[in-house]
């Protein structure tokens, strides 16, 4: 069977979007750590072998970047387990969080 590079690229891109959406949902609805309030996932860059994912994130202006990064580190195993339950992959990628920026976010709900 011929390997369809265009189809593989589409699948890769679709998985990046799916992982980003799932992480947004998990951070918003399932993670109870107050240090992760008002953290937004902006993009996911999945390695070509699907083993690693760089998760780009932003935080609300005034939040402690160091506290958020420590909280993300603590939550990584939980997030990977939940991703494994919701996204079909042979292996759930290792997550590496990459800070992008502090931004102004609207009031909390």
Would you name each region that the model predicts?
Residues 1-52, 58-109:
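Charge-rich, low-complexity N-terminal segments
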